Design a protein with these regions (language model features):
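N-terminal capping segment at the start of a domain
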Residues: 1-26, 83, 249-259
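Extracytoplasmic/secreted proteins, especially bacterial periplasmic and envelope-associated proteins
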Residues: 4-11, 23, 27, 31, ...
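A non-catalytic alpha/beta surface segment that caps or lines the substrate-entry region
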Residues: 7-65, 211-213
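Second-shell loop/turn segments in exported
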Residues: 14-24, 44-48, 85-94, 121-122, ...
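Solvent-exposed loop/turn segments at secondary-structure junctions
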Residues: 19, 42, 49-51, 64-66, ...
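Structural recognition of the beta-strand scaffold that forms the well-ordered cores
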Residues: 59, 76-79, 118-121, 147-152, ...
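Acidic/histidine-rich catalytic neighborhood of metal-dependent amide-processing enzymes
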Residues: 85-195, 222-225
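Active-site-adjacent substrate-binding region
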Residues: 163, 167-283
Length: 283
């Protein structure tokens, strides 16, 4: 698994910005679509207008077997953004999330499923969540229901050093001071989904430490809990959770030129992918 992850990361890590590196952004889009096809997913694109141009969310759809499809629940979304800010290669933010998502897709394509899984690589997350807002809005406009969205946002950096983990002010729960856990962030409406993920992770990936934070409303009282695509789904009334290493509250390379492959914990990314896969098969 480490070899596949490393291959994904090497292909994806580079600045992927809509203005300063559009070719690299398109290359990432093409790579993700090709990886979806390689593991047998049906590929489609959700195009949206933004920043004076057209951008695309890349969707890979995995349906349950024909017999199960007639009894299927609404779809589950597994998402990660593929753009970066300027002047960073974006290893943790967010090639790590993409690699975990692609690894989960590879693990699930022959699994027994009770619902459709949509793997969505979103674009322009770093530009006010434009891609995920456009997609969530399209779901609501079509009156489409989903089981929920699991958003992978910076899942590749760990530290065993005491004091390596910090937290935003006014946190309602105690946060460990060692940055070796996966954060699970949900709002109240998404708490059942988040607790199900937490229980599944503990059962199936025992060496993956997790910390669950549930915030009221849409996280308005703790703005740092709204900093990824899960907030777009909250906005349109859908359950969603963010899985994260907590970004700048742990990773000193966040949004810097030093956010490189060498700083990542591939074993941790593997465990996150295992937990996401286990969640999808347990529904």
């Amino acid at each position: 698994m480490d070899d596949r992850l490393r291959s994904h990361l090497r292909a994806l890590i580079s600045e992927r910005h809509p203005v300063s590196s559009p070719v690299s952004l398109r290359r990432a889009q093409d790579y993700i679509a090709e990886e979806y096809r390689r593991v047998g997913l049906r590929v489609s694109f959700h195009a949206f207008r933004a920043l004076g141009g057209t951008y695309k969310n890349v969707i890979g759809t995995l349906r349950p077997a024909r017999a199960a499809f007639h009894r299927a629940k609404p779809p589950l979304i597994i998402a990660a953004h593929y753009d970066t800010i300027q002047d960073t290669p974006g290893a943790d933010d967010n090639a790590s999330g993409l690699a975990a998502m692609l690894e989960a897709a590879g693990r699930l394509h022959e699994a027994s499923l009770s619902c459709e899984i949509r793997f969505i690589a979103t674009c322009l997350e770093e530009q006010d969540l434009l891609g995920s807002v456009a997609y969530a809005a399209s779901l609501r406009e079509a009156n489409e229901e989903i089981l929920g969205a699991i958003v992978l946002e910076c899942v590749g950096y760990t530290s065993e050093r005491e004091g390596s983990q910090t937290a935003p002010p006014a946190m309602p729960i105690a946060i460990p001071r060692v940055g070796d856990f996966l954060g699970i962030v949900a709002n109240t409406a998404s708490a059942p989904l988040a607790k199900s993920f937490e229980q599944t992770a503990k059962r199936e990936v025992a060496d993956l430490k997790t910390v669950l934070l549930v915030v009221p409303g849409q996280g308005e009282q703790l703005p740092d809990t709204r900093r990824s695509d899960h907030a777009a789904f909250w906005q349109f009334g859908y359950p969603a959770l963010m899985l994260t290493d907590t970004a700048n509250f742990r990773n000193p390379h966040y949004h810097r030129s030093t956010d490189t492959l060498e700083t990542l914990d591939l074993s941790f990314i593997c465990r996150v992918a295992q937990a996401v896969s286990a969640m999808a098969t347990s529904l």
